[in-house]
Amino acid sequence: MKLYKYCLAFLALTTVTVSGCKNEDINEEHHYDNKLYVSSTPVCDDLLIKPSITEATREISYRIASPAEQDIQISFDAAPAMTAAYNLIYNDNATALDARFYSIPNKTATIKAGDVSSDNIVIDFKNTNELDKSKRYVLPVTILDASNIEVLESARTAYFIFK
């Protein structure tokens, strides 16, 4: 009889425990913030200093996690002042790439409402054969500003390395 009471108590406790759980569809919940970030490789180190290579072009891709609710205006630019941060983070001794060796034809982009990305930002490198082969150069390109959304700080900048 005691065993019967214990089984009945256990069954009642189990029923209360199981029925007390909330039935929510966790797939409908967002467990992240919708922030803008650079989705291309953070460090592009395939740019070589060679007499035969005078020009190169690279692109920065960016995106947000969920479709935009409204248009997002984004501005990019080179940030040579971030060279020291690059050297500290990646334990390097690179020099900032001089402005005469690159151009960014279009420094703004727009992610339209309902989209998660837009056209890539193009960086044109020129006269790279004039760089000193004994040095490493870095060009940090960063998101300066974005309207209607926050920028993910850890993925705000892309670094282009010449070696």
Locations of the language-model features?
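Bacterial Sec-dependent N-terminal signal peptides
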Residues: 3, 13-44, 157-163
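A generic signature of intrinsically disordered, low-complexity regions enriched in glycine/proline
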Residues: 10, 28-29, 50, 149
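First exposed extracellular module after export/assembly in secreted or surface-exposed proteins
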Residues: 38-163
